[in-house]
Amino acid sequence: ALSEIAGGRRAIDVALEYGFDTYAGFYKAFVRMYGSSPKKSLYKTEVSVMFTEKELRNILANWDIPQDLPILDIYIMDGSKVSGNVWSVGEEYILKTESDAEYSSNRDSMLKNINIAKTLSAQGFAASIPIPTKSGAEYLDGEKISILTRGIKGNPLAKADRFGDNRRMFGVKYGESIARLHKALAVIEPDIKPQEQNLYTHVTGWALPEVKKQNYQYQMGLPDSFFQDYIDNFGVLFDKLPKQLIHRDPNPSNILFDGGEVSGFIDFDLSERNVRLWDLCYCSTGILCEWRGVDGIHEKWLDILAGILQGYDSVNPLTDEEKQAVYYVICSIQMICVAYFESVGELKELAKTNREMLQFIVEQEAKIKQLSNNL
């Protein structure tokens, strides 16, 4: 939409085409998403590549679907945009295009996503399998590939529900669903042949030294004993942890609910072979990152984490070593996030958020270990 306004079209006309009843509605949604007004954003020197309405229509013409369906950006229920390269088309379809951004999905990961979705579908899981183009291809292959799928019924759980009175119950549902997903992924892993990530060497060889620098630079207050404890104790546990094909990105936006139950998972672009604990812990930190404005965040997040662990363990029992390693895997995720976001200029604010999260997690070490040991 922004590129069309920049091209000289009237803002109200563009807003109406993109499904807003008024320009005011478009303006509010834009500010909520980008943090500034459309006018200010037009003058930014770095604007991500955007598709015009006409360009998206030309892409969709390659599929045998009604060509007058509305095209809208995808938002999770509390208003945050999921991605700049994914759109809903009518009520049934999802269009995804290859992204330019280094930290977004690339061609290989999109094709891997197709493979996993097809294999999960064959296992009886709800999955976004591709709709063939008019020529019978699974995707449109051009300068950028485009994939059209039928959306899985459901929406990400609202923040109000994640942190609400039923947070422990919803935590259990997250954990149970990840456990069922892991059972299916373990079956299909030989067909997918995923790349393997050694979490321990990845953190100790890169992320941990970077966080050490930031600990000094930003006066985070993490003691030297935190880093040494991680190296020593997680080093002993790591080789004993079960590893398999995992989702890798089960943040709340990628887990859909319908009627209060998990209806499916989306976006397997980052899937890899890693410790299976990663998905449980990543789900919990993905929820924690929305902590601002939540009263009693300490107790509420620990309730959610306890629910996730309990739900997973009831379906796919955790080993003793996994229970001991929960805290270290959560810290691994946070150190990776802190190191990565600080290295990308436009994401430094996210680095700050993740530093605060890491500080909070370290403060909660005893409680986190108690939760996992009580399973």
Model-flagged regions — what are they?
Residues 1-19, 45-49:
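Terminal helix-turn-helix DNA-binding modules in bacterial transcription factors
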Residues 25-26, 30:
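Short hydrophobic/aromatic patch on the recognition helix
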Residues 56-63, 187-190, 205-248, 317:
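An alpha-helical support segment within catalytic cores of ATP-dependent transferases
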Residues 80-95, 231-278:
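Active-site acidic catalytic loop and adjacent metal/ATP-binding pocket
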Residues 91-188:
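ATP-binding pocket architecture of kinase catalytic cores
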Residues 164-221:
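A cross-family kinase active-site recognition segment
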Residues 277-316, 331-349:
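Active-site activation/catalytic loop segments of kinase-like enzymes and analogous catalytic loops
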Residues 336-375:
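ATP/Mg2+ or Mg2+-diphosphate-binding catalytic cores
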